[in-house]
Amino acid sequence: MIGRLRGIVLEKQPPLVLLEAGGVGYEVHMPMTCFYELPETGKEAVVFTHFVVREDAQLLFGFNNKQERTLFRELIKVNGVGPKLALAILSGMSAQQFVNAVEREEPAALVKLPGIGKKTAERLVVEMKDRFKGLHGDLFTPAADLVLTSPASPAVDDAEAEAVAALVSLGYKPQEASRMVSKVAQADASSETLIREALRAAL
């Protein structure tokens, strides 16, 4: 089991990051709320990981802290919620925002996320609220504001294409993803900025 990685950020292709640790390059899937906080390419990063083994693939999911990883692990225990949907949930809102929505019993806040229908949202609220009773401490500490640390801005067309591709990988339909990015498009914006603003506008 790989639980933590410390290494150099080689590539950033939202929501994937390629992290070199001990001479090995690890492809790590990260929620966008965690991806925003990665250092620039060439710098060292530390991520807490969850390893998923499937018949057709072995996937590594990464998080900035243990609390985010704990929430991810609790999410994938819910019936009908797999790693991909859990990743989409934590990309659309921070861990603390999700906890708040569940604690306040607001399934409507979850329906706005890709792949979440009314029944799934209601099930998440019921099941996760029960699970939260056994979780205390930092998971309920207000999350810090997200900080974008990406240095250079790629060409606008490339940035928009990357943003659309990232949203599609999170569960949005191509047409919807393109529309979301177009609404927040701005000159010299990086793909990470476009993704963050598109997800924020969708809530």
UniProtKB/Swiss-Prot annotation:
One of its GO terms (biological process) is DNA repair. Residues 1-64 are annotated as: Domain I. Signal peptide: none annotated. Residues 155-203 are annotated as: Domain III. Residues 65-142 are annotated as: Domain II. InterPro entries: DNA_helicase_Holl-junc_RuvA_I, Hlx-hairpin-Hlx_DNA-bd_motif, NA-bd_OB-fold, RuvA, RuvA_2-like, RuvA_C, RuvA_C_sf. Homotetramer. Forms an RuvA(8)-RuvB(12)-Holliday junction (HJ) complex. HJ DNA is sandwiched between 2 RuvA tetramers; dsDNA enters through RuvA and exits via RuvB. An RuvB hexamer assembles on each DNA strand where it exits the tetramer. Each RuvB hexamer is contacted by two RuvA subunits (via domain III) on 2 adjacent RuvB subunits; this complex drives branch migration. In the full resolvosome a probable DNA-RuvA(4)-RuvB(12)-RuvC(2) complex forms which resolves the HJ. The RuvA-RuvB-RuvC complex processes Holliday junction (HJ) DNA during genetic recombination and DNA repair, while the RuvA-RuvB complex plays an important role in the rescue of blocked DNA replication forks via replication fork reversal (RFR). RuvA specifically binds to HJ cruciform DNA, conferring on it an open structure. The RuvB hexamer acts as an ATP-dependent pump, pulling dsDNA into and through the RuvAB complex. HJ branch migration allows RuvC to scan DNA until it finds its consensus sequence, where it cleaves and resolves the cruciform DNA. Has three domains with a flexible linker between the domains II and III and assumes an 'L' shape. Domain III is highly mobile and contacts RuvB. NCBIfam families: ruvA (TIGR00084). Belongs to the RuvA family. This is Holliday junction branch migration complex subunit RuvA.
